[in-house]
């Protein structure tokens, strides 16, 4: 016996009567937040320091033809970066508190901060930063038609069962990724569990930004922390 698939509600011979939209309570939970703020006042000084760090790498490393990007050493311990790192640390702590986390006995600490300088065709695949709480970017040199920052849906079950989108150019509940166009002087922060990527740089000019990650340490750990040379900076 041949089985027949019945399409419910697809009988075009019947006149379709539209019913009024039901008014339902709508609750939103488990959201993924992206935070941005314009801070052009940091551009001049941070840009100068960033170039110094990248130039050190250029002296010892040639630009890779397959992955044409320079990545600097850690920058957060440079005392000239203190005003910037203090501000970023304040934002990171404020974000976590506003999200409902209890940081009474905890402090925010930098684990990484480095410059990325992407040349033509360089980009980054989707990834995230484990063992951290807040990740972010400060955009420095942004050429015309710059790469996009892509934020990906972190829910594998939702991505697995996702239906086709009506309009992929619009940000809706059906979207699996959202893109942002960087601007010089923009700070962007997200939770570190939120995956991100960058589209390839189509320009002859490099696309440059500072990337940073912050984790959490206990206040007791802060009090017993080693002196100079420690790999975490409390902010």
Question: Over which residues does each language-model region extend?
Answer:
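Pocket-edge structural micro-motifs
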Residues: 38-39, 117-119, 153, 192
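Catalytic core of non-heme Fe(II) oxygenases with the double-stranded beta-helix
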Residues: 119-187, 220-225
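Short N-terminal helix-initiation segments at or just after the protein's N-terminus
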Residues: 56-60, 73-85, 130-135, 150-160, ...
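Residues at beta-strand starts and edge strands
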Residues: 31-33, 111, 132-134, 206-208
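Catalytic core of Fe(II)/2-oxoglutarate
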Residues: 170-235
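Solvent-exposed residues in well-ordered beta-strands and their adjoining turns
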Residues: 38-40, 139-141, 213-217
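Conserved double-stranded beta-helix
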Residues: 86-146
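Non-heme Fe(II)/2-oxoglutarate
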Residues: 2-102, 227-233
């Amino acid at each position: 016996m041949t089985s027949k698939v019945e399409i419910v509600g697809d009988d075009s011979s019947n006149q379709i009567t539209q019913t009024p939209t039901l008014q339902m309570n709508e609750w939103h939970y488990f959201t993924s937040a992206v935070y941005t703020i314009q801070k052009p006042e940091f551009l001049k000084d941070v840009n100068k320091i960033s170039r110094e760090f990248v130039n050190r790498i250029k002296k010892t490393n040639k630009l890779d033809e397959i992955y044409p990007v320079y990545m600097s050493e850690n920058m957060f311990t440079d005392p000239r970066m203190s005003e910037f790192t203090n501000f970023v640390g304040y934002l990171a702590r404020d974000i976590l508190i506003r999200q409902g986390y209890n940081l009474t006995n905890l402090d925010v600490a930098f684990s990484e901060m480095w410059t990325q300088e992407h040349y033509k065709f360089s980009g980054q695949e989707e990834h995230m930063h484990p063992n951290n709480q807040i990740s972010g970017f400060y955009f420095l040199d942004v050429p015309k038609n710059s790469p996009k920052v892509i934020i990906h849906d972190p829910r594998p079950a939702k991505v697995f069962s996702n239906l086709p989108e009506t309009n992929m150019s619009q940000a809706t509940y059906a979207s699996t990724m959202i893109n942002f166009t960087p601007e010089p002087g923009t700070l962007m922060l997200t939770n570190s569990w939120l995956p991100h990527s960058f589209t390839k740089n189509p320009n002859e000019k490099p696309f440059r930004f500072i990337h940073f990650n912050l984790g959490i340490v206990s206040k007791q750990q802060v009090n017993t922390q080693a002196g100079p040379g420690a790999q975490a900076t409390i902010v």
